[in-house]
Amino acid sequence: SGGFDFSFLPQPPQEKGVGLGPGPMGLMGPRGPPGASGAPGPQGFQGPAGEPGEPGQTGPAGARGPAGPPGKGVVGPQGARGFPGTPGLPGFKGEPGAPGENGTPGQTGARGRVGAPGPAGARGSDGSVGPVGPAGPIGSAGPPGFPGAPGPKGELGPVGNTGPSGPAGPRGEQGLPGSGPVGPPGNPGANGLTGAKGAAGLPGVAGAPGLPGPRGIPGPVGARGLVGEPGPAGSKGESGGKGEPGSAGPQGPPGSSGEEGKRGPSGESGSTGPTGPPGLRGGLPGADGRAGVMGPAGRGASGPAGVRGPSGDTGRPGEPGLMGARGLPGSPGNVGPAGKEGPAGLPGIDGRPGPIGPAGARGEAGNIGFPGPKGHAGLAGNRGEQGPAGPPGFQGLPGPAGTTGEAGKPGERGIPGEFGLPGPAGPRGERGPPGESGAVGPSGAIGSRGPSGPPGPDGNKGEPGVVGAPGTAGPAGSGGLPGERGETGLRGEVGTTGRDGARGAPGAVGAPGPAGATGDRGEAGAAGPAGPAGPRGSPGERGEVGPAGPNGFAGPAGAAGQPGAKGERGTKGPKGENGIVGPTGPVGSAGPAGPNGPAGPAGSRGDGGPPGLTGFPGAAGRTGPPGPSGITGPPGPAGKEGLRGDQGPVGRGETGAGGPPGFTGEKGPSGEPGTAGPPGTAGPQGLLGAPGILGLPGSRGERGLPGVAGAVGEPGPLGIAGPPGARGDGNPGSDGPPGRGAAGAPGPHGTVGPAGKHGNRGEPGPVGSVGPVGALGPRGPSGPQGIRGLQGLPGLAGQHGDQGSPGPVGPAGPRGPAGPSGPAGKDGRTGHPGAVGPAGIRGSQGSQGPSGPAGPPGSGGGYDFGYEGDFYRA
């Protein structure tokens, strides 16, 4: 019942007879020898993670680390081959010049590259040889050839005319920016003198070239527009909700190995444990391990010394411990130097298409009108009732087929021509990877200073200031009147030295000491409402590029302004001195969002910038539902190239009766590309219209101006696949009278046709609303240091901080000049008796005094004598 079972011990033989019960327990035998050392036990589990330690005090800032090794620039991939330039027109043949004088021949120059072959001219008829005419005037100098190697120095000839400059050579390859380890921030040094402007840094890595679009027809270059006045700044929008936390960044590289730790002190001796039972003999001895450090001897029970066994195997590394608790955030570091200008960012992803406007009413066909002047864009009208279907049109004649030209031979690579106008957009590629952080743009114009916000809360208590230097002594006061002299008192005994007297009245106020250390910056107050825009100032001289301002909200697209004349370039302003970088204060809480300001006036169209790098293809947009096909009217004569008409409302035609199939017309030339607008917001899902019957092709019209592209709607639901209609091969019918049939019933839903090719890029859509603030992405790599911007405007004066704690007592000041004599004091009290003075010197013997008068007669035998005036009787 829970006890030990001793049945395994040898039992005494059972004798029959009267049993007297079990005998007394025997004495315990002698203690056996200690058993052999047992095998090493298995490795223990790792203990739980300790509590996070208290954050240590912030150590002093380390010295500035040495400059890292210069980064090695890796030559980037060769840029894509540029498009060949448009071959120039053949020049006019010049008149033959008079034979010039032979100059000293130079050495033969290197052979220039062969230019792209121009178009072959028509072969002229063979002319007859005419008589030699008189020498013509001297022709103009041709373009200079490529420079040859220097020839031997000839005699100085007459100064020739300067030839035109040769074409620019191809641009060199861009190297990759070097990457060195970022050293720890050092203490901010004193402001140095303004150095000369350094050389430009290495250009950033060029993005991968996009797919080249088809070449567009070069249009005329528009005149440069006037720069419009900046509109008033809009108020700050409402703050978006906090985004979801971004995904964890990639694991950083492992840090460098730490220094080898010192050997810790020996632990205290453990208390002696109870003697365990003798262990069984352990297993096979392990391989010789590395000898461990011998610890201090423990105080055990005295037993025979055991034989030291061989060292055990080196243990396997334990399982990784649990991740410790997150440490407290560190103090903010010093402000690092400003970064250099980073590489240009990749273009952003196109936004979602905007909503489809309501369909306008279908109008009757009018006569062909003359092109009117361009009006403003009209608003979309309400959808009208469905009108009756018009008559089917006549079948047009097929256009003549063009002749196929011969394939030209590829010429050598010509000098890259100027950038042509952008061609129509190709089909959208898949969404590219998110680009790196864009470069900091140029700073925005400095806005008018808004009204001061409400005072923020008091800042933290500042550190005690430095003790001021002692002040100078005040002016001497007027002298007091001398008092009456008192009687001389008795000299008292010398008293013991008294204690220090009470502290005197405070002296004159000293000069103000140096300014104390700047206290901690208080939290920023709530932002005040934006002030009204000030009047436009006169244009200043051009200053240095300031730091990048925050991106403003996009205003609505303004109408294109009239092209103006190009203004003269202003003079470059002087570079301001670098200001001292102040400590970074804590981030203040965001103020309430102000109301939206009125929309600013539309800005004029700015100058065209240089062509940018080819961006990655954007993500493919979703295809909207196909609209119903209208009935095609008879082809009219080709009109003149009309002016650009107003943007009409989007119509929704009725499904008409099917006309006979027409022949395929000639492919018209591509329209001029429209300018790309910002993406609109996604529209509602449109209904899937019934497919219309193919109409007759119209005659080839002249190239029109690009129309305004409507917003792409969301894709509609898939319709039920209808049976395909058979295609007829009828001959052209005769012109019948125009009938007016009733509206045909809608046909069954056809199968969804293949996706059409992308049309020309439409006009800019309406500006989409600002989306919510996206999740904070991982921090990109630090860009190169940018040029230091101009010194900013002085900030508002901060609130006075709390009074600092009293500083330590300063050193004693120099002794001031003696003050004026005070009034005579009252008679003092009798002093203590003075110490007994030393014995005086014995005086000299006095001279003999005069004889005294005769004494009375003596009494027998005596005589009288005088001594110093005293009478003695002998």
UniProtKB/Swiss-Prot annotation:
Q: Which residues carry this modification: Allysine?
A: 16
Its cellular-component GO annotations read: extracellular matrix; extracellular space
Primary localization: secreted
| Source domain of life | Eukaryota
* 4-hydroxyproline carried by residues: 10, 13, 34, 40, 317, 320
Q: In which tissues is it expressed?
A: Expressed in bones.
UniProt feature, compositional bias: Basic and acidic residues: 566-575
Q: Please report the PTM annotation for this entry.
A: Prolines at the third position of the tripeptide repeating unit (G-X-Y) are hydroxylated in some or all of the chains.
Its localization reads: Secreted; Secreted, Extracellular space; Secreted, Extracellular space, Extracellular matrix
Q: Which UniProt keywords apply?
A: Extinct organism protein, Extracellular matrix, Glycoprotein, Hydroxylation, Pyrrolidone carboxylic acid, Secreted
- Where is the sequence biased in composition, kind Low complexity? 27-66, 110-143, 188-209, 218-236, 247-257, 346-365, 434-451, 463-473, 491-538, 545-565, 583-593, 614-623, 663-697, 705-724, 745-755, 763-778
Q: Does the keyword Phosphoprotein apply?
A: no
List modified residues, type 5-hydroxylysine: 93
Biased-composition ranges for Gly residues? 237-246, 474-483, 603-612, 648-662, 725-744
What are the start and end residues of every segment in region (Disordered)?
1-874
Q: Which family does it belong to?
A: Belongs to the fibrillar collagen family.
Reported function: Type I collagen is a member of group I collagen (fibrillar forming collagen).
The note filed under miscellaneous reads:
These protein fragments were extracted from an ancient pelvis bone collected in Newburgh, New York, USA and estimated to be around 11255 years old.
Q: Report what the protein is called.
A: Collagen alpha-2(I) chain
What lineage does UniProt assign to this protein's organism? Eukaryota, Metazoa, Chordata, Craniata, Vertebrata
